[in-house]
C-alpha cells in the first residue's frame, strides 16, 4: 500500500476538514458556556497555584473534580485572546477539527485511502462530536489524543520500533489526565491492536507492551502524584471527593460512582417507554433524559443521545464494518510468504482485533452506564468512524455479490431507521432515500457484465461510495444544522444563574462589600459559577458534593467576626422529602436562614430567601 496519497485525496481531505471546521466554528459565540469549568478557568488565570491545581474560586479553597490539563489550554487561550465564552471553546473546536485529518492518516496506513476519506468524513459530521467540540468541555481534547495515539500505534506496527509505541502510551496517559476513566474505553482495543500488529515473537511484543504500560502509568498518574508533593494545607479540597483528595475524586467520584451512581443533575420530563414524541420540537426531545441502560440504548429515537446524533453511524459501522474486517482477515491481498505480505496480513489482524474490541468495549460500557452524557461517547467516536469508513469502502468495491447484498441490506435499514428517527419524511429523509436508492442502483450496475470495464471498476464503485455516504450522512448533517441553529451544547449548566439575577447580585455585593475578603458565602460550588466568572472574587464554599459540609458553622462565624464575609447566597430551598444530600438542608444553610437577614428584595431580586446578610455582619 502506497504511503503517499494522490493529490486528489489531499484535496478531498482538505474539503472534509474545511467542512468540519465550518460545523464546529459557526455561531460558537451563541453556545451557552459551562459556568462550573469557566469559573475554574477564570480563577486559574489569577495565580500559578490556582493554575496547577485547577482552583474553582480565586481563593483556591476548592478545586475541580478532575486534573486541569485541558483547562490549562483554555487558560492559555483566554490569556492570549481575552476571556470570553468563545475563546474558552477554541481548544475544543480545534481539537475536533484536527482529529479529522489525523484519523485519515491512521486509517490510510492501516487500510486504504478510500476508507480513510470515508472515515474522516464520518467523524467530521458525527453530531455527538460536533456538539461536543462546540462546547467548553474536556472530551474533544481527549478524543484528539486518542486518535493521535492510534496513529502512533499504527506507525509502531509498521516499523516495529518501540519509540512509536512509547509515544502512544504517553499520549494515552495525557488523555487520562484530560478525562480520566472515560479514556479507558479505547485502552483494551488499542492494546490488542498493538499486540496483533507489532512484528516479532510474542515475548518481544509483550515486553514492548510492558514498557508502554509503565510509561502510560507514569504519565497518567503524574499530576495526581505531583499534588501529593504539596503540603495538605496548601492543596484545595477536590470537589466530588469524600475526603478532599484529588485521587478520591478521580477514581471514586469520576470512576466507580459514574458506573453505578444516580446522576445528581436535574432531570426533565421522565422518559416513558413506548410513548411517541412526533409533536415535540428537537430541543424539547433533547430535554428528555437519556434512555435508561439497555442493549438498544445507543439507538434510541429521542433524547440528547438519539440515533440522529450517534446511533445511525454506529449501526452502519457495525453492519458494514464487521463483514469488512472479517473479509480483510481472510484476504490479506499479498502473498503470505514475503515480508510485505506478512506485514499486510498482520496489520489487517490488528485492525480487526483492535477496532472490534474498542467498539465492543464502548457499546457494553455505555449501554449499561448509569450516569451517561453524550460527550462521553467521544472515546468511542474514532473507532466508529474508522469502522464505518472501512466498511463503506469495502462494500462499494465492485468485487463479489456478497458485498453488494450487504450494502443493499444496510442501505435499506438506514432508510427505515432514518424515517423513524426523523418522525416523518422531511427533506433529510428524502436525501437519505435518494442516496440509498442511488447506491443500490450503482452497485447493481457495477456488477453487470455488459457494462464497460472502466465504468464497472472505477466510476461505479466511486459512485456507490458517494451515494452510500450521502445516505448515511443526511440525518447526522440534519442534526448538526439543527444543533447549530438552536445553539445546542453538551456542557453542563451547573452554577448558571439567570443573567439579570446575576447582574443584580453582583452589583449589590460590590456596593455593600466593604473590606470583606470574600464576595459571598455560597451554598455550593455548583450554584455560584456564573458569579465567579463575572467578578473573579474569592467565595466561601459552604458544602461540597452530596451536601458534605465544607465550611462549618463555627468557621463561618469566625470569618464573619473577622469581617471577611458579610453575605450568603442560597440558591435553593430545603424541601423535607429532599433533605438527604440536599445542600440547602445542610447545617450551615439552616443556620444562615435561621439567623441571617433576607436582603433579596433590597438587591432587586424577584424572589426571596436567596441573598442573606449574615448574622453579626455590619449592615
Model-assigned labels for residue ranges:
Residues 377-381, 391-395, 399, 456-466, ...:
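Composition- and surface-driven signal marking solvent-exposed, interaction-prone regions
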Residues 319, 464, 525-527:
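A glycine-rich phosphate-binding loop feature that marks nucleotide/adenosyl-phosphate handling sites
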Residues 36, 40, 68-75, 245, ...:
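Extracytoplasmic/secreted proteins, especially bacterial periplasmic and envelope-associated proteins
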Amino acid at each position: 500500500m502506497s504511503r503517499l496519497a494522490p493529490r486528489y485525496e489531499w484535496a478531498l481531505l482538505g474539503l472534509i476538514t474545511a467542512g468540519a471546521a465550518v460545523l464546529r466554528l459557526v455561531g460558537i459565540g451563541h453556545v451557552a458556556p459551562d459556568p462550573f469549568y469557566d469559573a475554574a478557568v477564570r480563577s486559574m488565570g489569577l495565580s500559578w497555584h490556582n493554575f496547577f491545581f485547577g482552583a474553582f474560586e480565586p481563593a483556591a479553597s476548592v478545586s475541580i473534580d478532575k486534573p486541569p490539563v485541558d483547562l490549562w489550554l483554555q487558560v492559555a487561550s483566554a490569556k492570549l485572546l481575552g476571556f470570553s465564552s468563545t475563546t474558552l471553546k477554541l481548544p475544543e473546536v480545534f481539537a475536533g477539527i484536527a482529529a479529522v485529518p489525523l484519523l485519515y492518516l491512521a486509517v490510510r496506513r492501516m487500510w486504504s485511502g478510500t476508507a480513510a476519506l470515508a472515515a474522516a468524513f464520518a467523524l467530521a459530521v458525527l453530531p455527538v462530536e460536533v456538539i461536543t467540540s462546540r462546547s467548553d468541555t474536556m472530551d474533544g481534547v481527549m478524543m484528539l489524543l486518542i486518535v493521535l495515539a492510534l496513529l502512533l500505534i499504527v506507525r509502531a506496527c509498521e516499523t516495529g520500533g518501540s519509540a512509536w509505541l512509547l509515544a502512544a502510551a504517553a499520549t494515552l496517559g495525557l488523555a487520562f489526565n484530560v478525562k480520566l476513566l472515560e479514556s479507558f474505553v479505547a485502552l483494551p482495543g488499542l492494546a490488542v491492536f498493538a499486540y496483533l500488529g507489532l512484528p516479532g515473537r510474542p515475548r518481544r511484543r509483550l515486553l514492548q507492551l510492558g514498557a508502554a504500560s509503565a510509561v502510560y502509568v507514569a504519565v497518567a498518574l503524574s499530576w495526581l502524584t505531583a499534588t501529593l508533593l504539596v503540603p495538605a494545607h496548601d492543596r484545595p479540597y477536590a470537589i466530588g471527593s469524600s475526603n478532599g483528595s484529588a485521587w478520591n475524586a478521580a477514581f471514586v467520584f469520576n470512576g466507580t460512582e459514574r458506573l453505578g451512581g444516580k446522576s445528581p443533575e436535574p432531570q426533565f420530563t421522565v422518559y416513558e417507554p413506548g410513548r411517541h414524541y412526533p409533536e415535540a420540537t428537537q430541543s424539547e426531545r433533547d430535554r428528555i433524559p437519556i434512555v435508561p441502560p439497555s442493549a438498544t440504548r445507543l439507538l434510541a429515537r429521542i433524547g440528547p443521545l438519539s440515533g440522529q446524533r450517534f446511533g445511525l453511524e454506529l449501526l452502519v459501522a457495525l453492519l458494514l464494518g464487521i463483514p469488512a474486517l472479517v473479509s480483510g482477515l481472510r484476504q490479506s491481498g499479498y502473498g503470505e510468504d514475503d515480508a510485505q505480505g506478512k506485514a499486510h496480513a498482520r496489520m489487517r489482524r490488528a485492525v480487526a482485533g483492535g477496532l472490534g474490541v474498542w467498539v465492543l468495549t464502548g457499546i457494553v460500557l455505555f449501554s449499561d452506564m448509569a450516569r451517561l452524557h453524550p460527550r462521553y461517547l467521544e472515546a468511542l467516536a474514532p473507532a466508529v468512524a474508522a469502522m464505518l469508513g472501512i466498511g463503506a469502502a469495502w462494500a462499494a468495491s465492485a468485487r463479489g455479490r456478497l458485498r453488494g447484498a450487504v450494502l443493499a441490506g444496510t442501505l435499506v435499514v438506514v432508510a427505515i431507521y432514518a424515517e423513524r428517527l426523523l418522525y416523518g419524511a422531511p427533506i433529510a429523509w428524502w436525501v437519505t432515500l435518494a442516496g440509498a436508492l442511488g447506491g443500490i442502483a450503482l452497485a447493481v450496475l457495477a456488477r453487470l457484465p455488459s457494462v464497460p470495464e472502466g465504468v464497472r471498476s472505477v466510476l461505479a464503485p466511486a459512485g456507490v461510495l458517494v451515494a452510500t455516504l450521502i445516505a448515511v450522512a443526511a440525518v447526522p448533517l440534519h442534526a448538526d444544522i439543527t444543533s447549530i441553529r438552536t445553539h445546542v451544547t453538551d456542557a453542563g449548566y451547573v452554577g448558571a444563574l439567570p443573567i439579570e439575577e446575576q447582574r443584580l447580585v453582583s452589583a449589590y455585593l460590590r456596593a455593600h462589600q466593604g473590606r470583606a475578603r470574600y464576595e459571598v458565602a455560597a451554598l455550593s460550588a455548583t450554584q455560584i459559577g456564573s458569579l465567579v466568572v463575572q467578578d473573579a472574587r474569592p467565595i466561601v464554599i459552604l458544602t461540597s458534593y452530596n451536601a458534605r459540609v465544607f465550611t462549618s458553622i463555627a468557621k463561618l462565624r469566625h470569618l464573619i467576626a473577622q469581617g471577611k464575609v458579610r453575605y450568603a447566597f442560597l440558591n435553593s430551598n430545603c424541601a423535607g422529602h429532599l433533605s438527604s444530600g440536599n445542600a440547602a438542608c445542610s447545617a450551615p444553610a439552616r443556620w444562615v436562614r435561621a439567623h441571617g437577614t433576607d436582603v433579596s428584595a433590597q438587591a432587586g431580586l424577584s424572589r426571596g430567601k436567596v441573598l442573606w446578610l449574615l448574622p453579626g455582619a455590619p449592615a
